[in-house]
Amino acid sequence: MDVILLEDVKTLGKKGQIVKINDGYARNYVLPKKLGIEATAKNLNDLKLARKREEKEAAEELAAAKELAAKIKECTVTVSMKTGEGGRTFGTVSTKEVAEEAKKQLGLDIDKKKMKLDVPIKALGNYIIQIKLHKDVTAELTVKVVEK
């Protein structure tokens, strides 16, 4: 019996795959547990339409991420920190603070978990932060640390 998998099944395959399995295994395990559905003409057509929809949504997400990356590249976020001698800050500038300042100053809602600091920001100056917006799109945000 041909079955379209609705979920990843370790022994059979990944979600959306069409696999040939024994009738008994399909009727007694895969179908009752909603791990897959029978591969009828209607279900195959539904699968094809769902794949097209997913591809279209993925393309839209990628385009939106590229647009946001272009917007972010042009922007600079300014963070004010208390400093001691030699321009050293009291504490470090975290991704949380950068995300909050980006929201305040630029209106950009960026998740702090998507930001990557190469080195801790402990001094005044300009820094580049990598932001992973999409699996294929990474943006660079310029952060300027100034004295409070």
Curated annotation (Swiss-Prot):
Keyword rRNA-binding attributed: yes
Keywords in alphabetical order: Ribonucleoprotein, Ribosomal protein, RNA-binding, rRNA-binding
GO CC field: ribonucleoprotein complex; ribosome
Pfam families reported in the protein's UniProt record: Ribosomal_L9_C (PF03948), Ribosomal_L9_N (PF01281)
GO biological process: one example: translation
Domain of life: Bacteria
Any one GO molecular function term: rRNA binding
PANTHER family listed in its UniProt record: 50S RIBOSOMAL PROTEIN L9
Family: Belongs to the bacterial ribosomal protein bL9 family.
Function: Binds to the 23S rRNA.
Stated name of the protein: Large ribosomal subunit protein bL9
